[in-house]
């Protein structure tokens, strides 16, 4: 949600309901679904507020609610926190993760922020120049990077030139 793409002339309720109305879902079902999803994203009671009266974090929640209310099979997040300040980024990534797990939806989360990727993901794909460098859990990638690029990208790393004299199963001299 680099751009939240909210409809500025619609209130929160109508922004979230928009996709359901396009699909011609009955009004009573729309109301129930929208109110339930707004509760999930902690925006209940704000249905009548205009989107330009909301903070960045609240706008993000409305955009997330609008996507979730349609019950997609997969949700794509493209740099969703890039427009938020550092403190709100931490709060929102925790919220996104919590909501994603509660709903049980598969999410693809694109980010250049390593700490964000490590904290929100079950599985990470690290890419460089359009090529997959490594796929694994955050723990696997952090503790067992398979290339210098991955090690440098994920953590604070020191690289030392060395010569292996003897190789064992777990250690080298």
Language-model-derived ranges and their functions:
Residues 3-152:
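ABC ATPase nucleotide-binding domains
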Residues 146-173:
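ATPase nucleotide-binding modules
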């Amino acid at each position: 949600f680099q751009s939240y793409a909210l409809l500025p002339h619609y209130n929160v309720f109508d922004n979230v309901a928009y996709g359901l109305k396009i699909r011609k879902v009955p009004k009573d079902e729309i109301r129930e679904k929208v109110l339930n999803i707004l509760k999930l994203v902690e925006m209940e009671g704000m249905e009548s507020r205009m989107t330009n009266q909301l903070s960045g974090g609240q706008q993000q929640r409305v955009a997330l609610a609008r996507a979730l209310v349609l019950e997609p099979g997969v949700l794509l997040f493209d740099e969703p926190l890039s427009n938020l300040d550092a403190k709100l980024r931490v709060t929102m990534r925790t919220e996104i993760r919590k909501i994603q797990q509660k709903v049980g939806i598969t999410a693809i989360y694109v980010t250049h922020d390593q700490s964000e990727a490590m904290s929100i993901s079950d599985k990470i794909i690290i890419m460089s120049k359009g090529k997959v460098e490594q796929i694994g859990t955050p723990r696997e990638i952090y503790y067992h990077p398979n290339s210098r690029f991955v090690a440098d990208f994920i953590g604070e790393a020191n690289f030392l030139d060395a010569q292996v004299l003897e190789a064992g199963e777990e250690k080298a001299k």
